[in-house]
Amino acid sequence: MAVSMQVDIVSAEGSLFSGKADMVFAQAADGEVGILPKHTQLLTQLKPGQVRVVSGDEEDSFFINSGVLEVQPSVVTILADTAIRAEDLDQAAAEEAKRRAEDAMEQAKSDTDIARAQIELAEAVAQIQTITKLRDRLHKTGLS
């Protein structure tokens, strides 16, 4: 029997994913992490980006705007401020959010305004990257 782990992705809106997986990839503050079953315990902050949950030949993809990744030997929990299934992301809305954030950065008058615009820009860019990666994966597998 193959070794797997329980993966739970939870946001303020509720549980988005709960199931067994062979591997999880997430965008941690210091770079991408890959988690396998029986991984050493870990607690790390997540930055905006894609989370991939791999189980056999299946892969579920999500966008996380920020949150925390907790790893126990047989359980991975992601607590996210916002989590969206990658296929539910709206590219036009993400492009518009990116444009608005870039405009806000140009018009920012304080450090707080700049920081807020940088966060919004990072989230929009991460959404666009998640959409692009999902589209590329679907194209490679012939599902597009």
UniProtKB/Swiss-Prot annotation:
The record's subcellular location field reads: Cell inner membrane
- The reply on keyword Lipid metabolism is no
- Membrane topology reported for the UniProt record: Peripheral membrane protein
Q: Does the keyword Membrane apply?
A: yes
Q: Which CDD domains match?
A: F1-ATPase_delta (cd12152)
Which keywords does UniProt give here? Answer: ATP synthesis, Cell inner membrane, Cell membrane, CF(1), Hydrogen ion transport, Ion transport, Membrane, Transport
List, in alphabetical order, the Gene Ontology terms for molecular function in this entry: ATP binding; proton-transporting ATP synthase activity, rotational mechanism
**Major localization listed first in the record, in broad terms:** membrane
Q: Name one GO cellular component term.
A: proton-transporting ATP synthase complex
Q: Which Pfam families does the annotation name?
A: ATP-synt_DE, ATP-synt_DE_N
InterPro entries (UniProt xref): ATP_F1_dsu/esu_C_sf, ATP_synth_F1_dsu/esu, ATP_synth_F1_dsu/esu_N, ATP_synth_F1_esu_C, ATPsynth_dsu/esu_N
**What's this protein's family per the entry?**
Belongs to the ATPase epsilon chain family.
Please name the PANTHER family in this protein's record.
Answer: ATP SYNTHASE DELTA/EPSILON CHAIN, ATP SYNTHASE EPSILON CHAIN, CHLOROPLASTIC
Briefly state the protein's biological role: Produces ATP from ADP in the presence of a proton gradient across the membrane.
Q: How does it assemble?
A: F-type ATPases have 2 components, CF(1) - the catalytic core - and CF(0) - the membrane proton channel. CF(1) has five subunits: alpha(3), beta(3), gamma(1), delta(1), epsilon(1). CF(0) has three main subunits: a, b and c.
Q: What name does this protein carry?
A: ATP synthase epsilon chain
